[in-house]
Regions:
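Core catalytic lobe of class I
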Residues: 1-266
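Short, conserved SAM-binding/catalytic segment
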Residues: 269-280
Length: 280
């Protein structure tokens, strides 16, 4: 099945992924549902499901709903995942939420002192050290305050606290790299109303589309801008016509692409080279 086909690919992606990595998974609704357990198996955490609504123009005029017995399908999904960091304590893997509480408990200090450390009334206990679903990762500034307080006032025999290597606490910039980037564009939701490709953007040979699954450049640029910065690496293992590479060039990202269909590769290679010449 589709899950078996994807698993070796996901296994290899996961070896190189870090907590800064965002994975955008394009597929049909049922395709995504089939592969989702494999993504979870290799440590990918679901964030959100974005729906590409291609609109009524995507529906063929001769669609016979009496025959197909369902509504016309005009959507694809693009699902956002991040690589969740784990912390290892005596060979036990802990998620960040559990590890933060574990480290503070080692200090011997009451949890109420986390508020004092952060200079807040109760935000630290309500947000950063809660056991419930309202938990979220402390910002780097708050984490730095928590770490400094713990290592200043915590029990001497447990120091250093909030350390990965047992030698020193995690630094502020290191903590920032334990969460994937995300920049939310104003006015954009998880439903993307964008027509199917037409005109010059749709690459054709003899009036026939070269790649039936070519994505709009605007949508690829959107997901790159939301989760990367200039100079970051973008990897597209199923590159097709290299729309991701084109978007990355425009956005000053470093893109690596792979495509095994020789005919599609030749067109994609030409497309990238011509686009690069325009930029020079």
């Amino acid at each position: 099945g589709l899950d078996d086909w994807y698993e070796p690919h996901i296994k290899e992606w996961s070896k190189k992924a870090t907590a800064l990595t965002t994975l955008w998974f394009w597929n049909t609704e049922v395709g995504w549902a089939t592969v989702h357990p494999i993504l979870e198996k290799y440590g990918w955490k679901y964030v959100s499901c974005c729906v590409w609504d291609k609109g009524m123009s995507h529906v063929a005029g001769n669609t016979n709903t009496k025959t197909i017995r369902h509504l016309p399908v005009v959507t694809e999904v693009c699902v956002q995942y991040v690589k969740e960091p784990f912390f290892y304590v005596e060979n036990k893997a802990m998620k960040m939420k559990e590890w933060l509480r574990y480290e503070w408990e080692r200090t011997g200090l009451p949890f109420s002192k986390t508020n004092e450390a952060c200079g807040v009334v109760n935000a630290a206990t309500r947000k950063y050290f809660t056991k419930c679903h309202l938990w979220y990762m402390p910002p780097a500034e708050a984490f730095e305050k928590i770490t400094n307080y713990a290592n200043s006032y915590g029990a001497e025999d447990g120091k250093p606290y909030f350390s990965i290597d047992g030698e020193r606490p995690i630094k502020r910039d290191e903590w920032e790299r334990l969460r994937a980037k995300f920049y939310c564009p104003i006015g954009v939701t998880n439903v993307w109303k964008e027509p199917q490709l037409r005109n010059t953007e749709r690459l054709k040979v003899n009036q026939k589309a070269i790649h039936l699954n070519q994505k709009p450049l605007s949508l690829i640029k959107r997901i790159i801008e939301m989760t990367t910065d200039e100079g970051d690496v973008v990897w597209d293992p199923f590159a097709g016509l290299c729309t991701t590479a084109i978007a990355s060039m425009d956005l000053k990202r470093e893109c690596y692409s792979a495509e095994k269909n020789e005919d599609v590769y030749k067109v994609a290679n030409k497309r990238v080279r011509e686009h690069k010449k325009k930029e020079e």
